């Protein structure tokens, strides 16, 4: 892109421009003559030159000199102006800047500088914004050197804002550059030219910043960063590597580099150097695996270990441990002095648009490794080699590397999961034989505790908290017990990390006084913005002063609070923020939904009163309610077997006595919601081909991608009641599937994932033996108002014998308890009637109608709804017929309206009588009315 400029005023001309008005400046390709640009300025008009395929900016006659406000620096380049356009008031002066020589990282730094200026509300970007851009770019040599000097983007931003302040807002679309910034850009080109580079990178921008005595140098000195030391470090790093070997406009894949091992360091990371600098986490344990890797690396040929293990067991940590050993000199002479470099395969493949580019990169990398002779490549996710870079007519990375791997010319450590190794590596026997597998097992809980203690210091420094030993032990044990689909030590480390974040956030809140000032500050900033919009700049200036004062007060309060906390910690009065076992338990509960926190006093009383609470919904059936309550208390206190489900029951008995209702009541009362119940109607699994729906359809069948009805429900909510209703109706193959659920608390779905049932309560209902119960009903005493315990024992034994004939012994033997439900007595049915009538009262009360029923009506309902063979369901039908249908007819006829209160009674003939409170002549009720 070319910028064509009018002749500036004499006071603003460079010495080269003052010779004559007709003089054109023709700078070299590596250096641009930068002309200061006084405000105000207009945007130039962009037209495309047809002859040379360039773009020219033809400034109108009154246009000022060059704007370096680049909308798209990556596409910009400055060239000589064409002859068109004519001259008015003198000749045009061309300032040409070779942006085609700037690397992607340098362009990114320049664009970020413009954004930093926009963020601060400034109309132009200065040298201080260029400094922020170099830091913010993050990956270039300039950013690395500045980070090493102690500058972070956040701290540098705060320093620049404190020094330069904020602008008035209303930032133009195009951010210009100050004269100082232009001098920096020119100086960066001069530095590149002096170093013999045909490109300008972020390192050259930093060298240019060090030459310009401006705001950027002031910022550096405020951070006690010595410019001479920074310059020396930049030169040293440039001699080792280069962030880009081609300018932006150069042909892809062309050119050559003058660096020692550029491809390796461009596409990889030096783990040995990171280990020497102490930037790698310590590796605890894994002695056997590291020794085995060293042993394989010492072979003459095929000296390529491949670490195979589940995700998160620490395969990458073994490579880092090897790098730490090499850095410490604690290795045999066969690999002493070698360098471990981890290769980024994604970065190696990225950008290879044309055929042959990927192969050229890979061959260049292999040549560098061979020439150096002291390089050990670490390929994380080594299975990505298979197929990497393979386009039509090309070969993939694995086939390119095979000869070198077999001859021992290339030493490589691979790491991949068991599944990926089987799918990709084992499928290619020629590739498999070149790698020597090293199995990396999941560490035990005790080994994980040791790993966490080794990492403790790193996480304490990062989160600025302290970890107790109990919290680390809890993280290892709870993650092993409750997080089933991941592996140690990864899941335990994540628990420790998130618990530290939780405690830090909890203790990082502003003081109360600072919070009030923060609210006031937000209000003032809103008023200032409104004043700027209404162009009341006098008011905006006054508000700006208040804003600065408030920010200063808030900062002083925060600093004072931090100093007090630090003083308390240093003096021993306060231990500082500490991660405890309870914090780790809280994180586990939030991840899994399983309550693992210690039982509180309120929960203890609720657990002890569980029977009475369940009896509000379940009438009778004391044995079942007691067994359920015992299982829940045992699990909550932590005395149950952690390898099995909370409990597994089978409820047997006649229909309508409360088997399914007890499971619903338990889910609503203890688990907090009726939705915390996975209910499967086993009549849906009567046929053989439907059994697979529990764990998911096999591959190739409809529904394979959806997963199983049972396994997916438990994966989403592991802490729940699982109700298998009418279990005797299921196909016999279902019981084979239940064996491992009842015994081991686990089930494998169709995709090979293990689903954990260890935090579920398994309840199965069955009508097996209901005939025996009905025949022996009078022995149970349902004809009267009591129940005979002796008769119940006889009937229970008979039902258990019936179940043994129906179910297999290996199935019944895995159940915790078989509970036989009693038939309902008339007194129990009357109590259930009160519960059902209360439900109807609540529903009609929602419509604004009060309802009372008499004792006589209640007896009528019980009389018509009592059937010992069918339980409570006939009672529900009687209430529907006698009460709900009668009230419905009255409401539709307009006899009962919202706001009325009605009494429902029964006459001597058993007919239902409904009387409204507003109607005259209420009948003389022989039985008193009561509110349900």
UniProtKB/Swiss-Prot annotation:
Residues 99-240 form the Clp R domain. Pfam families: AAA, AAA_2, AAA_lid_9, Clp_N, ClpB_D2-small. Residues 102-167 are annotated as: Repeat 1. Gene3D superfamilies: 1.10.8.60, Clp, N-terminal domain (1.10.1780.10), P-loop containing nucleotide triphosphate hydrolases (3.40.50.300), UVR domain (4.10.860.10). ATP binds at residues 309-316, 653-660. SMART domains: AAA, ClpB_D2-small. Residues 518-553 form the UVR domain. PANTHER family: ATP-DEPENDENT CLP PROTEASE, CHAPERONE PROTEIN CLPC1, CHLOROPLASTIC-LIKE. This is Chaperone protein ClpC3, chloroplastic. It comes from Oryza sativa subsp. japonica.
